[in-house]
Amino acid sequence: MNRFIALAVLVVGSSFAHAEDWSQFRGQNGTGISTEAGLPVKWSKSEGVRWSMPLPARGVSSPVVHGGKVYITCSSGALDNRLHVLAYDGKTGAKLWHRQLAATGGTNCHPMTCMAAPTPVADDTGVYAMFATGDLAAYDTDGTLRWYRSLVGDYPSITNQVGMASSPVLADGKLIVPMDNAGESFIAALDRKTGKNLWKINRERQINWVTPLVRTHDGKTEVIMSGRGVVTAYYGETGEKLWSQKDTGPSDIASATFQEGVLYSPGRGGTTALKAENGTFKELWKSPKLNGGMSSPLVYKNIVYAATGAGVVNAADAVTGKPLWDERFKGKASASPLAGDGKVYIFNEKGLTTVLKAADKAEILAENDLGEETLGTPAISGGAIFIRTDKTLFCIGAK
């Protein structure tokens, strides 16, 4: 028996030794797609769970996984002004460290969200955690505070009375911080070692919850930021505006994705497929059926998926926009769908995951219920799916 247990631990440890990092919101390139094989199909609270750990407080941010560590944020207190950053061992779920901050910005927000709404981003040196209060902290892998900034302290006019949720990302070795709000709106690149501004570009004052998308085109890193009525690409090195297009109807909640040079921009009127090169802009197609609301679209194996707040998954051809199928799932989705290993994962707000076969015809493979509120988008790494609920961090996968 001891030899069997040792072998099982070795197998799980080996999977993490070769695990694909999932270092930011929706994975390495922000598309929500894993390249790993052997991803789970069926699970419940009592079966198919590699480990689970109680969380100290609520959060709607996503977990991120880098170098075998799982990082997550939470917020607590009567005013939601106690901010938490935690690290767990990805193999065992053991808590590695837990750090707390006092919020410096306002904590007003919609009841559905909280101050732990932006997803952290990680690299080999540690994790960068931003909160809806405008507090931003960088920790080493061992939990040592490297630097801290109060963005509200630096820019006092920042305000959003329903909460902020845009997440930081990494581009060209810089920490990209989106800060669209009703006050001083901007997007900035920070030095990862010091937290100091490298460039800062002012943007139109607007409430916006979109996370930037990073892609490389013609040797240049583009940081693509959507907002109400406009999508803009900035040069990652300098912040120079590369291109911008108005009247595309982009969302101020769901984030864009891309595949093979095509940008899929979600909006209140559906999803638009855009081709942007060398300062020129072309709309390829627009589909009003692909309207995910708060959930970002997924493009996988040449199919675009949108999970709606009405409990319907719509699928369309990624090249033409032609509708392929729609399928009703239980509940409604706030989290964005993920994909990998030929499967598409749809997460509803009550903790039920619908697993679909990635195909041009609808086929439900499983429905898996954890029975806890799930608003944050999960992460995939080491053959496992990391799901954060309002109470628990689950690692779903074979033991």
Short names for language-model regions:
Residues 1-2:
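N-terminal secretory signal peptides that target proteins for export/translocation
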Residues 5-15:
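Bacterial N-terminal signal peptides
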Residues 18-399:
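Noncatalytic, solvent-exposed loop/strand surfaces
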